[in-house]
Regions:
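Membrane-interface alpha helices of multi-pass inner-membrane proteins
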Residues: 422-438, 443-449
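Transmembrane-helix motifs of polytopic, lipid-linked glycan transferases
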Residues: 348-371
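Beta-sheet-rich sandwich/jelly-roll-like modules and their strand-loop junctions
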Residues: 7-100, 116-134, 144-200
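Start-transfer (signal-anchor) and selected internal transmembrane alpha helices
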Residues: 1-30, 189-231, 471-472, 528-545, ...
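Membrane-lumen/periplasm interface segments of multi-pass, membrane-embedded glycan/lipid transferases
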Residues: 187-188, 458, 463-467, 473-541, ...
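Interfacial juxtamembrane loops and adjacent helix segments
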Residues: 259-349
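Transmembrane-helix signature of polytopic, membrane-embedded enzymes
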Residues: 216-220, 341-344, 365-384
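Short acidic/glycine- and proline-prone juxtamembrane loop motifs at membrane-interface regions
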Residues: 392-399
Length: 746
């Protein structure tokens, strides 16, 4: 009797999971049906003969046309031009059959009188492509399978074209039909692709509903749902259309070549590739649209791979910079190359490796966090944007997972004395977080939220506080050293080009800044022991203002473009000069107007970038899902951040101000870096995307949860995570429809 309630509860949870899976599969089927209904006739054509001089009548013997096809070019059928001579016949049917040079039938397509009225082009497409391995001549047989009550003609040339004779029965006509080769055709492919998505999306919906209904541990929920929905993103995102994916692919490919002892650079400085990869590498964002989708899928299934030998010179430049954040993608690509997989399979291996590492890091972050913060981290980790990045080759996915882990560990250490493994993990996370993008370097300051007495067990009183502050200073110093080791050369070049500083001056400023940070920490520890924190914050604020004034004064003395230089323009109409710190200090009003205008015009796009409701590379394609999904995600995150009535705040008042300051530092750093590549002719910031601020989203939600406002009687983490998972699933499906429905991509 004791087990019956539990058994019934498990059945209810299982029923919820099955219902969610059924709804997800039904949504996939509807998406496939809708896309097939709208796009099934979409095709692209190559002209074989464009001469429309005379007619060839379709007789009982039929017509036979020979069509040469080059090797490697897909053939989905042909398109012919008919003429019923201004007559709409009540009956009749035409069949077009394609045969290989060896006489093997590739398939036959029939069209009846309803499709052939007047002077009209009629396509006869096959569902799957035939790709000849060598140059080949195909045979096109045209027959009337049902008699026509009148004359039906096809347009042709006055004379026979070279190698393309036309026969009526066995008699040569001495002409060539006006024929177009169908090189791409949508057909029923959208439905097939939607059914492929039904597996990861249905499984993800089942696991989300089942685990959340059972109130399972949120780390397991995060890992399972992130993997399933991320797999769907791997399939939905067209090749090389994720943010900067073509650049990331070149970096990963070169690193994989080095690990496998293959040459990486040709004589012209271009990247060396395998033979099967060379046709697909590029230096720009890939194509989208249902035809591009199907071409990539066909190539993935049919194109052979190559041995892991780089012999062909590609388009990308060799020697592009990269760091350790590419490790998962490099290993995935290396495995695919070792197995001899083709290009698209290799790309999928790299994406899946990136997704796997992100899911593990996201689950680790949720496991490290205190229970009150787990819902926030789970909701943030399951947003469409981090999963889209994880389902591509972007190193930002690894960075997001590491920042989430670092924040979660800092929150964890606020609740108890640190164990040895936690101290080591804190130092490791600070060191590996720092080397990536400079805008995230201020995030290591989050370790200051840890009470210093919690950092070293076995000590008490003033000694514990002092040693704790020293440990925090050591963590910050380790992060700074790690960043300098990875980015010192880049930083010196940046300061030299955008701030007018030489290398020695930049190093001196960095050393002074590090000394100031250490002095501030020591002063804070001393004031805290003497209970004079208010005096410290006053002096600190005055010091910040003085430092800002000094920077402003020094920047005003640095050279900036003259008015004559500022009117110069490149051939594309842009200014050759970008915003710099000295320029901003010289022209404060112009800079402020540009920033305010950017905030007004681009803030919705930044929010979309944080949530992930704009897909792919927004600078190239604007793939925006419904604003209702974005609104739902904002509300779900707000629900996840609601504090429980009677609960203890995660952050103290001073700590909350410190976290807010850290977030502000990251935002300011992102703005300054974006200004450095914004031409002076622009009226808004160029290239600042919302995803740059995504790693700090949980910190913002923590501040909202810490605020005194609306309280709820019980934890809202599970409903919020269910809502985020559902909306992410809908984003994937609508994104698939928008990607497929994009016109003009081929």
């Amino acid at each position: 009797m004791q087990n019956k309630p539990d058994f019934k509860r498990e059945l209810r949870c299982l029923a919820w999971g099955l219902l969610a899976a059924a709804l997800a599969v039904l949504a996939c089927c509807w998406t496939g049906y809708d896309l097939t209904d709208r796009l099934s006739e979409l095709a692209s054509y190559t002209l074989i003969n464009d001469d429309y001089t005379r007619y060839a009548d379709l007789t009982e013997q039929g017509l036979t046309q020979l069509v040469p096809v080059p090797a490697g070019e897909p053939v989905y059928g042909v398109r012919l031009k008919f003429d019923t001579h201004n007559t709409a016949y009540p009956a009749g049917e035409v069949q077009v059959e394609l045969l290989t040079q060896a006489g093997q039938s590739l398939g036959a397509v029939r069209r009846d009188y309803r499709d052939i009225i007047g002077d009209v082009f009629v396509a006869f497409p096959l569902e799957d492509a035939y790709i000849p391995a060598a140059d080949e001549t195909l045979t096109v047989r045209i027959t009337a399978t049902q008699p026509w009550p009148g004359v039906v003609s096809l347009w042709c040339s006055a004379e026979e074209k070279d190698g393309m004779p036309l026969y009526s029965g066995d008699t040569a006509v001495g002409a060539t039909l006006a024929v177009q080769q169908i090189t791409a055709y949508a057909g029923q492919w959208p439905m097939r692709k939607a059914l492929q998505l039904a597996l990861p999306l249905g499984l993800g919906a089942f696991l989300a509903a089942w685990l959340l209904k059972r109130r399972a541990a949120l780390p397991w929920v995060t890992a399972a749902v992130a993997l399933c929905l991320g797999c769907a993103f791997v399939q939905v995102t067209p090749a090389l259309t994720a943010p900067d994916e073509y650049t990331h692919l070149a970096v990963c490919y070169e690193k994989a070549s080095r690990l496998s002892a293959q040459p990486t650079q040709g004589q012209d400085g271009k990247l060396l590739l395998r033979e099967c990869d060379a046709p697909y590498f590029g230096t720009k964002t890939g194509k989208i649209g249902v035809l591009a989708y199907k071409q990539a899928d066909t190539a993935r299934r049919t194109q052979p791979g190559s041995p892991n030998v780089t012999t062909v010179t590609g388009a990308p430049q060799a020697g592009q910079s990269g760091n350790g954040y590419y490790a998962p993608q490099v290993l995935g690509i290396l495995l695919a190359r070792a197995l001899g997989k083709n290009f698209y399979t290799m790309l999928a291996y790299g994406r899946m490796a990136n997704l796997l590492v992100y899911a593990l890091l996201a689950a680790l972050a949720v496991a490290l966090a205190p229970k009150a913060a787990q819902g926030i981290l789970t909701a943030a980790a399951l947003l469409p944007m981090p999963l889209q990045l994880a389902g591509s080759l972007s190193p930002d996915a690894l960075l997001i997972g590491l920042v989430f882990c670092y924040l979660a560990l800092c929150l964890r250490l606020r609740t108890h004395k640190a164990a040895a493994w936690e101290l080591v993990l804190l130092a490791v996370l600070a060191a590996v977080n720092a080397p990536n993008k400079a805008i995230y370097l201020p995030a290591v300051l989050l370790c200051l939220m840890i009470p210093p007495q919690n950092l070293l067990a076995g000590t008490a009183g003033k000694t514990a506080v002092l040693r704790g502050h020293l440990w925090q200073a050591g963590v910050l110093g380790l992060a700074a050293a790690s960043w300098c080791a990875a980015n010192l050369g880049t930083a010196l070049r940046f300061f030299g080009s955008h701030a007018g500083l030489g290398g020695a001056a930049a190093l001196l400023i960095g050393a002074v800044a590090a000394a100031c940070v250490l002095a501030v920490l020591c002063a804070f520890a001393r004031c805290r022991r003497r209970n004079t924190e208010k005096r410290f914050w006053l002096v600190f604020a005055l010091g910040v203002l003085a430092a800002a004034a000094a920077v402003f004064a020094v920047a005003r003395r640095m050279p900036v473009p003259t008015p004559e230089m500022m009117v110069e323009r490149l051939p594309n109409g842009e200014s050759p000069y970008c915003y710099t710190v000295p320029y901003a200090c010289h022209y404060v009003t112009v800079t402020l107007k540009m920033l305010v205008r950017s905030a007004v015009e681009q803030s919705p796009l930044w929010l979309q970038g944080i949530l992930g409701t704009t897909l792919g590379e927004p600078i190239v394609y604007r793939i925006d899902v419904s604003w209702l999904i974005g609104l739902g995600l904002v509300l779900a995150l707000a629900v996840a951040a609601l504090p429980v009535q009677g609960s203890t705040p995660l952050l103290g008042r001073h700590t909350a101000w410190g976290v807010a300051g850290t977030v502000l530092c990251v935002v300011c750093a992102a703005v300054v870096v974006s200004m450095s590549w914004t031409p002076l002719s622009y009226t808004v910031l160029f290239g600042l995307q919302g995803r740059y601020l995504l790693p700090m989203l949980p910190a913002v939600l923590l501040l909202a949860k810490n605020a005194k406002g609306i309280f709820v009687p019980r934890d809202t983490a599970y409903p919020a995570c269910a809502a985020v998972s559902t909306l992410t699933l809908l984003t994937i499906l609508q994104g698939f429809g928008l990607y497929a429905g994009w016109q003009g991509a081929i």
